[in-house]
């Protein structure tokens, strides 16, 4: 599988602005900020207190099925991920990454601190094959349940990037931690399944274009 788009670590900097920089109050946490809705003014941004840094983990599920090639969807997703990985690396946040493509979702990272190796993987990421997103969500739910038993004080977040182009799916349980679903579906004809998926997961919903408008 070849990479069909380059990741751009600065892709969100124009849109999220200060949400990717550090200020006097501490680093702005853009993922938790987005979980509360689009920030429209400075006071909407959540910052990490400098005096206390509780353990934090971001679990990221990436849909890289063939349909995400359309209209540059994967290219935009890679821009989001490049920035996310860079922010996690700077703040020494732990990551878990699930790659949903082909027949079965695969773990790329499972709770380690962010590393530059993730950027290397991202540069090679291309779209193709089926959409094992349901498998990814089930694996993520099981892994999070075990993680929460092992590390009950850890702050966990789930980020799902997908165009939602599934034929159908059974009822899904709500995610066990604060969650954000980023809809990659673009173009003139949109099925809107990602929004339905977000509702079932109890996740905040954002279209990827919104991340560049903030």
Indicate residue ranges for each PLM-predicted region.
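Acidic/polar low-complexity segments with low predicted structural confidence
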Residues: 1-55, 114-115
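Von Willebrand factor
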Residues: 53-111, 114-161, 165, 183-192
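VWA/integrin I-like adhesion module and closely mimicked acidic/polar interface patches used
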Residues: 164-209
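Charged, alpha-helix-enriched surfaces in structured cytosolic catalytic cores
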Residues: 25-29, 53-56, 72, 76-79, ...
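C-terminal "exit" segments of structured domains
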Residues: 212-214
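Short hinge/gating elements
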Residues: 14-21, 64-67, 103-105, 122-123
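Conserved, well-folded catalytic cores of nucleic-acid-processing
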Residues: 37, 87, 125, 143-147, ...
């Amino acid at each position: 599988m070849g990479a069909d788009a380059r990741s751009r670590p600065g892709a969100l900097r124009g849109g999220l602005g200060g949400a990717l920089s550090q200020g006097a109050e501490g680093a702005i946490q853009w993922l938790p900020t987005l979980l509360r809705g689009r920030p429209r003014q400075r006071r909407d941004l959540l910052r990490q207190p400098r005096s206390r840094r509780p353990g934090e983990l971001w679990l990221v599920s990436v849909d890289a099925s063939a349909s995400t090639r359309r209209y540059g969807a994967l290219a935009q997703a890679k821009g989001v991920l490049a920035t996310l990985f860079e922010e996690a690396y700077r703040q020494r946040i732990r990551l878990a990454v699930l790659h949903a493509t082909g027949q079965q979702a695969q773990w790329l990272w499972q709770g380690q601190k962010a590393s530059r190796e993730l950027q290397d993987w991202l540069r090679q990421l291309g779209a193709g094959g089926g959409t094992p997103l349901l498998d990814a969500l089930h694996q993520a739910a099981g892994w999070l349940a075990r993680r929460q038993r092992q590390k009950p004080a850890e702050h966990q977040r789930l980020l799902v990037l997908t165009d939602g182009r599934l034929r159908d799916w059974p009822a899904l349980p709500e995610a066990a931690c604060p969650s954000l679903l980023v809809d990659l579906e673009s173009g003139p004809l949109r099925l809107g399944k990602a929004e339905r998926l977000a509702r079932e997961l109890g996740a905040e919903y954002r279209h990827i274009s919104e991340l560049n408008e903030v």
